[in-house]
């Protein structure tokens, strides 16, 4: 779609608008028109509106001109609101290339009304829509009763605006990679995120339930991501336990070390679907899982039962059944065999081998209802920490044309625009433990095992930061447009990482409040719609 208007350059459109009940953001200055067929009116109708108004005012006595400027300024404001509302309507129509004329008119009117408040100055007339040869023209006028200009015979001004939309069949694929860690439970943040993400889905889908040219994915993350969702394939998994770090927390002399076998031994729990990070270099690559290379396969997340009668541990859910030091008791795989354990998988505080494992991701889908239902179901999950790198990795993978999840079009396809939205409310974080583990269990195991090349939590955080930066570069190299959002976060270092991660500096957003987050998501939604503008 391409939008033209009297004040926009070709191909440009407003990047923000609002849903019903929200106050939209400001747009650019307008021009005005006046209804009476007079010399002054001809200048009002001049598309170079500001010059016309200045010249017209010069013809009046100074006092009358000063008074008329008040009415003309009010007309400017009305023009802004008309143009903003038409932009929103135009973006909605342009993103629905399969809609009929009647459907377009209803859709455009709905978005126009939502963006032109009844309480605002000016009474808008009917929205006029004309469609031909793939082009849609939208126009509207509003009448504004005058105040000072009544004295010189002008009772009202009619302000008009018009845009042209070229509808195009360019597809859009969007991955929302959203922080669902425990800190999102504070200050109403998870509720604000649900609302903002639902706004984005609603704006992009408009009135269409299953559009042909739009698919979206949702990737909630903690330190791990849950991939057990429709389309999941066990061929992606390290079933035989051969990956480099599979079973590193268990003693092979005291029972199974394969995480699938450990789950099989528990009578009242099964693998929920979270996976560990792959070993380097595959942790930051989109390499497809291959049965002949175990390190490309994914290891099921299994938080070990931590020792009985020990302080500082966050997940003690089974009887140790043996004596010895804490490491010996924790690494005993035999205690899971044919046993019932204490399990609680209800967020936010959980217990058991799936502790801190969020809801499954949603692969690319064109189902509006599926996305909205899963957005509304997001919850914060305590413990483990925050691993932005793992969330980003899975956002990249769901957009990829290859396994795991192959719904995405090929990278570089000129008929498809791919985008990724990455949000966090915290730094890459590892929950500490004053224990032999040095941390909570995470998607890269315990810090104390040294899987990241260090047993120091601070150094481990820096390494994860580096992995985020590496992946941002690779994702952008695949032609994916990245938007980044920090939410109620006071961290200059992460802000810099996210600013550099975004495709352009202006696509990084800092949202210090719940209200601002909603405005950010709406702005992103309209920018995403603009990606489908013919240029």
Task: For the regions a language model picked out, list residue spans one by one.
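Divalent-cation-coordinating short motifs within acidic/hydroxyl- or histidine-rich contexts, strongest
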Residues: 2-3, 98-102, 172, 182-402, ...
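Alpha-helical assembly-interface signal, strongest on the long, hydrophobic N-terminal helix that forms
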Residues: 2-10, 25-105, 182-185, 482, ...
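N-terminal polybasic/positive-inside topogenic patches
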Residues: 17-23
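Soluble periplasmic/extracytoplasmic beta-strand elements of cell-envelope proteins
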Residues: 92-94, 137-139, 160-166, 173-177, ...
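Von Willebrand factor A/integrin I-like adhesion domains
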Residues: 112-118, 471-535
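Solvent-exposed loop/turn segments at secondary-structure junctions
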Residues: 142-145, 169, 180-185, 222-226, ...
């Amino acid at each position: 779609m391409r939008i033209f208007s009297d004040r926009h350059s070709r191909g440009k459109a407003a990047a923000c608008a609002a849903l019903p009940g929200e106050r939209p953001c400001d747009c650019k200055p307008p021009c005005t028109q006046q209804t009476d067929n007079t010399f002054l009116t001809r200048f009002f109708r001049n598309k170079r509106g500001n010059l016309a108004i200045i010249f017209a005012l010069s013809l009046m006595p100074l006092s009358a001109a000063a008074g008329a400027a008040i009415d003309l300024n009010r007309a400017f404001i009305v023009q802004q609101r008309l143009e903003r509302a038409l932009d929103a309507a135009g973006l909605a129509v342009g993103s629905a290339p399969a809609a009929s004329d009647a459907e377009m008119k209803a859709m455009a009117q709905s978005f126009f009304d939502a963006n032109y408040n009844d309480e605002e100055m000016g009474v808008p007339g009917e929205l006029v829509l004309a469609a031909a040869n793939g082009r849609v023209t939208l126009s509207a006028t509003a009448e504004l009763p005058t105040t000072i200009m009544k004295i010189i015979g002008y009772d009202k001004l009619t302000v008009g605006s018009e845009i042209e939309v070229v509808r195009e069949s360019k597809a859009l694929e969007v991955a929302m990679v959203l922080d669902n860690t425990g800190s999102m439970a504070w200050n109403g943040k998870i509720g604000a995120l649900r609302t903002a993400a639902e706004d984005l889905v609603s704006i992009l889908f408009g009135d269409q339930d299953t559009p042909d040219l739009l698919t979206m994915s949702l990737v909630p993350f903690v330190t791990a991501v849950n991939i057990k969702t429709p389309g999941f394939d066990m061929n992606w998994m390290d079933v035989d336990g051969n990956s480099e770090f599979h079973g590193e927390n268990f003693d092979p002399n005291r029972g199974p070390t394969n995480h699938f076998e450990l789950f099989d031994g528990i009578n009242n729990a099964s693998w929920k679907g979270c996976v560990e990070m792959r070993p380097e270099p595959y942790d930051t690559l989109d390499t497809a899982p291959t049965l002949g290379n175990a390190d490309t396969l994914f290891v099921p997340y299994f938080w070990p039962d931590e020792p009985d009668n020990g302080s500082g541990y966050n997940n003690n859910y089974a009887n140790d059944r043996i004596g010895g030091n804490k490491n010996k008791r924790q690494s005993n795989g035999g205690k899971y065999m044919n046993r019932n354990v204490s399990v609680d998988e209800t967020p936010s505080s959980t217990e058991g081998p799936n502790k801190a494992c969020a809801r499954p991701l949603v692969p690319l889908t064109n189902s509006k209802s599926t996305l909205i239902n899963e957005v509304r179901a997001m919850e914060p999950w305590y413990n483990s920490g925050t691993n932005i790198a793992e969330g980003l990795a899975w956002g990249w993978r769901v957009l990829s044309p290859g396994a795991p999840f192959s719904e995405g079009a090929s990278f570089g396809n000129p008929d498809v625009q791919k985008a990724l939205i990455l949000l966090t409310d915290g730094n890459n974080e590892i929950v500490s433990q004053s224990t032999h583990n040095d941390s909570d269990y995470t998607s890269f195991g315990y810090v104390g095992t040294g899987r990241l090349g260090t047993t120091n939590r601070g150094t481990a955080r820096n390494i994860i930061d580096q992995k985020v930066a590496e992946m941002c570069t690779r994702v952008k190299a695949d032609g994916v447009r990245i938007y980044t959002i920090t939410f109620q976060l006071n961290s200059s270092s992460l802000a810099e990482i996210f600013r550099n991660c975004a495709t352009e500096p202006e696509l990084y957003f800092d949202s210090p409040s719940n209200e601002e987050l909603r405005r950010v998501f709406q702005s992103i939604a309209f920018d995403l719609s603009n990606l489908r503008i013919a240029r």
